[in-house]
Amino acid sequence: MGLEAARELECAALGTLLRDPREAERTLLLDCRPFLAFCRRHVRAARPVPWNALLRRRARGPPAAVLACLLPDRALRTRLVRGELARAVVLDEGSASVAELRPDSPAHVLLAALLHETRAGPTAVYFLRGGFDGFQGCCPDLCSEAPAPALPPTGDKTSRSDSRAPVYDQGGPVEILPYLFLGSCSHSSDLQGLQACGITAVLNVSASCPNHFEGLFRYKSIPVEDNQMVEISAWFQEAIGFIDWVKNSGGRVLVHCQAGISRSATICLAYLMQSRRVRLDEAFDFVKQRRGVISPNFSFMGQLLQFETQVLCH
């Protein structure tokens, strides 16, 4: 199906819609940029669209199957197909018009699937002229802020900024996602630092680190050692379920092990891979940019590669 029926929407017009609560509720905004770009900054109302080599191959399938891959939320797809949404708006990095889109680009593929699946209903399908770059310049107040680097907590515990402390204990926990933080056992023992980050739950990925504040935070323990014999992948779904539970309850979770290098980093990588449907190398680069010391052991990396196959082929 061609894209002749796709309308084009100006950035200022989208801003007007998103500032109206009623119209914002009836607008589905889909961001086709790479995952790392989305996480750095995005329109607050937007949903990321997964895209990888496997999805590129599946994009040659029936429109309904393509839409299921690019919009995994079944309830949202149902609302869309039933015509309960007034409009679906697709955006990329900065394309000025639909005519500029390559046929194999995620924005082109998604627009085609949306047009086909909504053809009998009232939902209008739009492409945002100028993409995120244009919208960010026009309506910066409707975009998320780039994550700030973690700062050493102030107060009595000065060891976090002490150059004598191990590098993995310096600074504070780092924000991976707005509700997901990664750090070390030392970070998990700093009450002031946890409160400064808004932490409400702690996922302890170790067999030896204590849970310091059980009366203040919700804890979950994954009692594994950091060695080549451990099957950490057996814990992936339980850990992912806990993180999602914290997210859905409006909280924030710190994932830590002893040093915040191998075990807890592995759990965060698995979470990103499944929740965002991205490859291991993409998730690794994303986390590495935020916590440069991460280094899952060789066995954990192998298990993550196997998990990647499961996630992307699901």
Swiss-Prot record:
The active site is at C257 (phosphocysteine intermediate). Belongs to the protein-tyrosine phosphatase family. Non-receptor class dual specificity subfamily. Gene3D superfamilies: Protein tyrosine phosphatase superfamily, Rhodanese-like domain. Residues 172-313 form the Tyrosine-protein phosphatase domain. Induction: By mitogens. Its EC number is 3.1.3.16, 3.1.3.48. Keywords: Hydrolase, Nucleus, Protein phosphatase. Dephosphorylates both phosphorylated Thr and Tyr residues in MAPK1, and dephosphorylation of phosphotyrosine is slightly faster than that of phosphothreonine. Can dephosphorylate MAPK1. This is Dual specificity protein phosphatase 2. One of its GO terms (biological process) is signal transduction. Its main location: nucleus. It comes from Homo sapiens. Residues 23-144 form the Rhodanese domain. InterPro entries: Dual-sp_phosphatase_cat-dom (IPR000340), MKP (IPR008343), Prot-tyrosine_phosphatase-like (IPR029021), Rhodanese-like_dom (IPR001763), Rhodanese-like_dom_sf (IPR036873), Tyr_Pase_AS (IPR016130), Tyr_Pase_cat (IPR003595), Tyr_Pase_dom (IPR000387). It comes from the Eukaryota. The keyword DNA repair does not apply.
